Amino acid sequence: MARKAVSRKRKAPALPGAGSDAQDPQFGWDHSLHKRKRLPPVKRSLVYYLKNREVRLQNETSYSRVLHGYAAQQLPSLLKEREFHLGTLNKVFASQWLNHRQVVCGTKCNTLFVVDVQTSQITKIPILKDREPGCVTQQGCGIHAIELNPSRTLLATGGDNPNSLAIYRLPTLDPVCVGDDGHKDWIFSIAWISDTMAVSGSRDGSMGLWEVTDDVLTKSDARHNVSRVPVYSHITHKALKDIPKEDTNPDNCKVRALAFNNKNKELGAVSLDGYFHLWKTENTLSKLLSTKLPYCRENVCLAYGNEWSVYAVGSQAHVSFLDPRQPSYNVKSVCSRERGSGIRSVSFYEHIITVGTGQGSLLFYDIRAQRFLEEKLSACYGSKPKLAGENLKLTTGKGWLNHDETWRNYFSDIDFFPNAVYTHCYDSSGTKLFVAGGPLPSGLHGNYAGLWS
């Protein structure tokens, strides 16, 4: 009987959807889902293109903001100091970056100079005199303020007479004019409220509004073309207003610091009697309000944070954050933990407030987290152990101190004097921090300047 032939060919696996095997998990996925999707038709509308570009720019801007914020958060712990030697100059009170490598500074000894942060070269700038120079009798006050206008074409600072306002042209630092008929005491602070108008705050309790007109600028150019000797105009104040003195000691109503809110066209002012004053600035100065500060000793510095719509006010041991539109009891204050030495300078960069103290410290307050940045734990062998929760603190270097008669008679038994941070400023990239000052006691003569990067 013949044996039945058997085929040795393997059966092909059943296709999904063909019979009961279609439900097997091994074959349960649908190939049709993985077919190439048809792309939408390209829209050639100009409006569509512009809207797409706008969204893309918004995303790039948002990413850039996040990146800048992250850098501002991480930078302070990475900064390293490089000191500059300023010779025998006495106490740097004011500073501003002119460009990526030059910083202009003003001192207690009434010297205006530019330091090149790459070469350390110091260049002194001639200071401008009143039309009657013989009337200058005050000594030991110096240049307390330096400010650049929004377009960075003009610089305002103090003159040879500390009561007068001096204007220079940038980037050449050629003299433009002097406002010499306004204040009866030293100028402590300056704020530009437009490209051609600046406000000065004085120790006599007044605020002066000055305008650098096109006529003044044109005459300045013409005079420079004719004469090689610097020639400049003399201008008169556009307005002169006294801060309120009704409820305080009139002798202590000194305008110490100014800060401008460009969005609302409002100018904040701090006086040494512990008050904050707000002014409207539209071709003149109109008072809006005055409020008592929660910490009213040694209110010597003020800054405005545009993104946060708050003023930061420094006092003897605290930084207070003030929104003029909120009730005074809503003012938040933070303690620097360096009692007695005073907050000497304050600034905003992104969400970080940098605080310079009389003890030579730089502290960094995170306004979003509402706390000071803390030290990162160091695992390096031989390094000083850092306590958990300890504030991140940078300390200024030794600087220079004159061992004169005052030092020998009163301070020679003290080994080291910290250099108060009277001024600090970030460059446009936010990666370099210029810091300057000098010894805190008024009788001591010395200086400090350094680049932290």
From Swiss-Prot:
Record Pfam families: Beta-prop_DCAF12
SMART domains according to UniProt: WD40 (SM00320)
Biological processes, Gene Ontology terms: protein ubiquitination; regulation of autophagy; T cell activation; ubiquitin-dependent protein catabolic process via the C-end degron rule pathway
GO cellular component: centrosome; Cul4-RING E3 ubiquitin ligase complex; cytosol; nucleus
Record's subcellular location: Cytoplasm; Cytoplasm, Cytoskeleton, Microtubule organizing center, Centrosome; Nucleus
Region annotation (Disordered) ranges: 1-27
Basic residues: compositionally biased ranges: 1-12
Database matches in PROSITE patterns: WD_REPEATS_1, WD_REPEATS_2, WD_REPEATS_REGION
Domain of life, source organism: Eukaryota
InterPro entries given in the database record: Beta-prop_DCAF12, DCAF12, WD40/YVTN_repeat-like_dom_sf, WD40_repeat_CS, WD40_repeat_dom_sf, WD40_rpt
GO molecular function, one term: ubiquitin-like ligase-substrate adaptor activity
Metabolic or biological pathway, per its Swiss-Prot or TrEMBL entry: Protein modification; protein ubiquitination
Residue windows of the WD repeats: 138-178, 182-220, 250-289, 338-375
Region (Required for nuclear location and interaction with MOV10): 1-38
TM stretches of this protein: none
Alphabetical UniProt keywords: Cytoplasm, Cytoskeleton, Nucleus, Repeat, Ubl conjugation pathway, WD repeat
Quaternary structure note: Component of the DCX(DCAF12) E3 ubiquitin ligase complex, at least composed of CUL4 (CUL4A or CUL4B), DDB1, DCAF12 and RBX1.
Function: Substrate-recognition component of a DCX (DDB1-CUL4-X-box) E3 ubiquitin-protein ligase complex of the DesCEND (destruction via C-end degrons) pathway, which recognizes a C-degron located at the extreme C terminus of target proteins, leading to their ubiquitination and degradation. The C-degron recognized by the DesCEND pathway is usually a motif of less than ten residues and can be present in full-length proteins, truncated proteins or proteolytically cleaved forms.
Family of the protein in this entry: Belongs to the WD repeat DCAF12 family.
Name of the protein: DDB1- and CUL4-associated factor 12
Species for this entry: Bos taurus
Lineage: Eukaryota, Metazoa, Chordata, Craniata, Vertebrata
Designated gene of the protein: DCAF12
